[in-house]
Amino acid sequence: MEAISSELNYFEAPVIQTAVQEEYDQEISPIATIQDGAPIEFMVKGVRDLYLDLNNTKLEVCLKICETNGTALVAGDRIGVDNLMLHSMFSNVDMEVGQKQVTDPNNLYPYRSIFETILNYPREVLDTRMICEGWTKDTAAQFDVTDPTGANTGLGTREQNYRASRAVRFIGRPHLDLFHQEKLLPGGVDMKLRFIPHKAPFVILNAAATAEVPQKNLKVSISSAKLYIRTKKVSPSLIMAHEQMLQTGTYKIPFTKVQMKTLTIPQGVTNFQYDNLYLGNLPDRIALALVHDEAVTGSYTRNPFKFDHYGLTHLGLKVGGEQIPKIPYQPDFTTRDYLREYMTVLSALGFDMGPNCWDITPTEWANGYNIYVFKITPGPLGIVKSLSRAGNIRLEIKFREATTHNITAILLSEDRDILEIDKNFHGI
């Protein structure tokens, strides 16, 4: 078949869409007055002709750091905070669509957010848009520095925003499955969101207390929160067509389902295996990082986003006896021999070819950004899908020396799922 280039095609009129008649941001306030430490809940009632574009919806929060009794920080106080504050300040976010719970209950929302931010966004995004969400890159190999005046320049930059308990405002898209897909939420479907604040020792970083400078009792105080939902008014003819099709079928919204889980690697081991890490339909991709267990539970003096290698010398997955990756991760951090492992991560992320570059250098990856990625499903993970795999996954880790404390392995998995909505606008 002979093709013709667009600059020579004069006889076809441009396609004009008439389905979306109006587009705007709808401001939603919490259903109750915000109280320190209490969940922040939003209720969005479905309207028949208003479809919701969650992919372009934003959460805005205004907050400050102060003492638990409300006293403002004084000029000499130097209080650091976690990276990506818009998200790390919440332990979990519950989401309900059409009376169906579509999120898993856990306290790992900060880790999902930081994983997705570090792994998915190139430098151009991190240095611009993600600043609005509280992102400032921590200095590699300086994650243990909790004094904001120290060598971690990222921590120092963030600290300046909170001096004297000044109000700080962040805005960005929540890290929720349905907020990262392109289909609109149909009109008439109710949606509930519940943001659960994290405890202060997880969010706030401060130098260790001394006799001269005791540890202050601090809190994150949220003064306002708003949800800006991108709303699209749809033509009556399209609504009628949708409702007619609903009589014999359902709305189907495919999305990438992200699940978080943790494993505890005990003190005093050089080998760690875990059978049945995933069972049944296997995820398309898995990311793993190791964190000090005290940081995960919350500590003023430990950065929860320090992903250490702990002298790891072997890391791999067994899927029905098959090794993934075929050549397992076998870094030697004592001799700085880890470039192949770094490139394996880039390949699993899709940053090994083309113009997009990962923001993490090999040296940074080995010094606090040590995240490993496993691609389970062969082929592309975009619009064109390969068949999912089924079976079970075994995790194998080896360390050069015995672990000196408990380590938490944090895992993020990506799989495919579909949300269906029936004619009563209920999720099924």
Each PLM stretch: what is its role?
Residues 1-428:
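Short, low-complexity Pro/Thr/Gly
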